[in-house]
Amino acid sequence: MKYALIILTYAISICSAQFGNNQSMSKTGTTVAQFLKIGMDARSSGMGGAVAGQKAILSGIYWNPASIAGHKGIGVQFGSYDWLVAMKYQFAIVGIDLGEKGVIGLSVINLSSPDDLVRTVSEPHGTGEKFSTNDLSAGFTYSKMLTDRFSLGGSFKYIQQNIWHSTARTFAVDIGTLFETPFYGTRLGVSISNYGGKMRMEGRDQKISVDPDQDNQGNVEFVNAVYETEYFPLPLFFRVGLSGEFIKTESLTLAYGVDALHPNDNTEYLNFGLELDYRKLIFIRGGLPSLYKQDKIEGPSFGIGMNYLINRTSTLLTIDYSLSDYGPLGEIKRLNISFNF
């Protein structure tokens, strides 16, 4: 435990020195597909998102695709919860262990909004029509242990956003590595998320009819035209994470995680999390996300979890719950269920 504390303190001190200096420009609001930045699962969110260095977790498909290389059997995980401003966030993951050939995973993420009134300048109370938004990410992941300490993984994703009759779409990749160091099991994870093409909205909502010369009569009064929208990049993340155990006994484990993140649309920041594990049955978690982020609203996060081996089968049922504080925007409660066959 002493050596784990030394390593963790050293890592935090280096990162704090780097991130304590605010960047002159955060580039906030310059990327699209913001739903890709939402923490997927309850376990990871309960630890403040500090899981890039964790191993054998199915939700690592989102955080670091290399971390699923140690997954055993067939795993299924899904969740559905209310996001901010009455939106709904849903996800599903499937992981399949191929033995020495590695692990493959499939994932789907969806963020949707309820119907709302279509309003215009001339009809601010509504035209009688309704619109909604829908974001989708569907991906395929492959991860493999290259040695007994080092794993490599990657994901290929299709990303789409819809607003009423307009759509933007592109493709992206995630790449990650995970290395278990010889220093008392401390693990180092590195990942790049959402490296891909730019997106812009296109569809019949951009089609208009205009009169190019309103001062003259008798000319062509209506010309079909299209609003030309701009391309915007995806929210790119570079993560470096450390994880390990302060305490590791037969009945009790206290694990930690600390992630340093460099996004392309905000200032650099740290995530820190802890997980107390009692006999692999009961889990208590806490986290501090977005440390040193400029103008952050995120507060502490908390979580609990439970493993249950279904009678007369080898199926493991896992239930995870987390509570995340978003300051003036309220709290987000996550609940997800996992099965491992």
What are these regions (language model features)?
Residues 1-23:
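Bacterial Sec-dependent N-terminal signal peptides
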Residues 18-341:
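Subset of outer-membrane beta-barrel
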